[in-house]
């Protein structure tokens, strides 16, 4: 019989899952930082909308041209970027890189020291670092004869030319691009290997080394060390680690929504009793969900469900690289009309830079209605006013609240950070589903996410396989009660043997 163990690990910067033995699944946890300055109080919706639409031009290339979707930092002032990034350590000795968290792309890439036309400073207030394979004792260049290269060439994610290097060349819809070659080196991370012991771990991974960049990628005000793609491709870090049994094939994030930002990114699963799940639409390059309807203040909007159906040029994508949220025209107009109708008596509707805004003299919580995005599987995503409103630029009469949902210029609806913030999101790739629940993503709250080792059965070969997950504080209470009852049952059964 497997044993049960509750382990509590409280730390502001790191949470992880216990590794109970060979084949166990420790969680890798990365601390997030918010690109928004802490003193920012307003957002130019037009600036964000322009940045997001440039990004969407790149995303849509995956539908028509089969080009791998890599996000760039944006086409506008980074003050309004609204992007989350994390630090990863690569090489020997380990070197730290700031990389953008992006569920809309697949592969981790960082800038090479030999990169041409690459910025040397960043408007994000971070020091830029450059990867030098020659300075890492564990680095190796992926050659054209390598099996990894031959397999990804078949999916147009690699190419071979001179120098026998397995290369890549990504061109984006805004005219920017990056090219380089694949390398293999160590990724370093912290792991819980017992109830309270943190160990330094590492694993060899394949990632991109950018040697040439063009367009907006070359501009210092938008510069960052690279992109951390969390897509479903076999070369994503999540897929690589999961294929070797180092982590489960699942990752989670909790983005803090206020001005100071931050949060947690976990290569593992966070459990919460209020979590709801919706199945991923199969055979899609992005994280597509089946959005079926939208309700405002409990009233279903008059939207034909077919406008959300997934096809070559339609669907609903979850994308952490998009700041706002975009709805297809057939859904956007009814949504705005419903919000206007709900608040017209207590606010002053105004149009600012083409966006519907409202002058409000009191808290928006008691004025604006609750919104429900309803997905397949009976999963509802409940949105508070802060999940669909943003502060606009000051106008005559005050600083308005503006609708952060925008009209998509195509048939694809995209759920960006505006609706993803202040929620735990779980991308369960093994079960092909995404889960979410409201959660306070402040560091002081996140530090009370607990580690639960729920059992250590043995397989036929005698290998210990521990089932592990991160659990929220509220879930821990119910687990303790359940385990206490199981222990009593076990004791009673043994006593009567």
Predicted regions span which residues?
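Disordered propeptide/prodomain
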Residues: 1-99, 107-181, 204, 219, ...
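Aspartic protease catalytic domain
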Residues: 2-39, 91-93, 101-103, 173, ...
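Generic preference for well-ordered alpha-helical elements
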Residues: 81, 180, 184, 248, ...
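Beta-strand secondary-structure signal
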Residues: 85-87, 184-186, 252, 370-372
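Aspartyl protease active-site motif detector
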Residues: 86-145, 187, 227-231, 304-346, ...
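Charged, amphipathic alpha-helical segments
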Residues: 164-171, 234-239, 350-361
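Extracellular/lumenal carbohydrate-interaction signature centered on repeated Trp-anchored short motifs
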Residues: 178, 244-247, 308-310, 364
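Eukaryotic endomembrane system proteins
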Residues: 181-192, 198-277, 282-296, 316
